[in-house]
């Protein structure tokens, strides 16, 4: 009945009723360029500098690893992985260093992926600006029109999501 009659729902937290919550509408009013958000927590990121193109992906395959995301740009490879235990990701970083001699492999743990699905690419800059204005550092950014993936600290995921969701 709510969908049929186009009745908006206001969802609020039982624990924080003073907060505005989330308004869910059945129709798009055109005011927001954001279609929605998705996220994934407890991620780790490996950055690899100085390896030949394609070598990090080949090394990961040889080690039997399936990354969540792998991107290569200007001599840098960024690999996102489910964190698992800290020991597992640290061991993987050490194994990659052995597989890729001469390459610099750095590991960052306790990250989250926040994806903004945008209706147009014009909505991307305000989302990024809102997240950064909230004091959330974006460690890696992948633009994939119309949307983007932002890698943020896991502890700041909720702040990033709240900031992005109110961006204009």
Regions found by a protein language model. Give the residues of each.
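C-terminal catalytic "cap/lid" subdomain
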Residues: 1-168
